């Protein structure tokens, strides 16, 4: 479910030494399965463990996960990295915003998952997002851009060199093209 690097495990052990005995960590997702999902790590004293929690054993401590967060922490990775700027704990949870769908799920579900898990997080740095409007009989995914992407002069590059390439590679043989249905109006909301 969750992998924690050796450096992160050592970091947690050091932090937990200063806590009450038998305190562990809790890994959780606030608003799981939504675009506003956020992951976190906190201390988990023994009296805060619920019967429905999952307990994962690591070197020197346990990671406790609540039942609601568990499916959204599938494939999550926690690392502790040090660079010239200092040290930082990172938590990557690719399924926090959208529950991973099965490979045999309908094409529309798999495309929506890809949009929420991979594409929209990239566009969010510019205040943008994209939504799947329909899949045509010809296998074309029709998208609509919103936020900072609406009216952005780089939207064609984003679509052709980014999104379309990713989607056609991921859904080879199922999608033939990716098209934009947005009526772009440049304004203060536009990124470029």
UniProtKB/Swiss-Prot annotation:
Binding site for [4Fe-4S] cluster: 149, 152
Cofactor(s), by name: [4Fe-4S] cluster
Cofactor binding: number and manner: Binds 1 [4Fe-4S] cluster per subunit. The cluster is presumably bound at the interface of two monomers.
MF-aspect GO terms: 4 iron, 4 sulfur cluster binding; iron ion binding
Keyword terms of this UniProt record: 4Fe-4S, Iron, Iron-sulfur, Metal-binding
Taxonomy, superkingdom: Bacteria
GO biological process: iron-sulfur cluster assembly; protein maturation
Family: Belongs to the NfuA family.
HAMAP family the record matches: Fe_S_biogen_NfuA (MF_01637)
Protein function: Involved in iron-sulfur cluster biogenesis. Binds a 4Fe-4S cluster, can transfer this cluster to apoproteins, and thereby intervenes in the maturation of Fe/S proteins. Could also act as a scaffold/chaperone for damaged Fe/S proteins.
NCBIfam families the UniProt entry points to: PRK11190.1 (NF008392), YhgI_GntY (TIGR03341)
Subunit structure: Homodimer.
Protein name (Swiss-Prot/TrEMBL): Fe/S biogenesis protein NfuA
């Amino acid at each position: 479910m969750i992998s924690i690097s050796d450096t992160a495990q050592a970091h947690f052990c050091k932090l937990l030494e200063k806590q009450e005995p038998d305190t562990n960590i809790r890994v959780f997702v606030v608003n799981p399965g939504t675009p506003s999902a956020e992951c976190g790590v906190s201390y988990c004293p023994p009296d805060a463990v619920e019967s429905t929690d999952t307990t994962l054993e690591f070197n020197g401590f346990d990671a406790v996960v609540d039942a609601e967060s568990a499916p959204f922490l599938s494939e999550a990775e926690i690392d502790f990295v040090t660079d010239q700027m200092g040290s930082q704990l990172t938590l990557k949870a690719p399924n926090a915003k959208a529950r991973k769908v099965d490979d045999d799920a309908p094409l529309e579900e798999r495309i929506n998952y890809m949009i929420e898990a991979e594409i929209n997080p990239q566009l969010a740095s510019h205040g943008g997002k994209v939504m799947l409007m329909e899949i045509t009989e010809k296998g074309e995914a029709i998208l609509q851009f919103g936020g900072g992407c609406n009216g952005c002069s780089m939207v064609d590059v984003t679509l052709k060199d980014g999104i379309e390439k990713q989607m056609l590679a991921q859904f080879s043989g199922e999608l033939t093209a990716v098209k934009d249905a947005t009526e772009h109006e440049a304004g203060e909301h536009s990124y470029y």
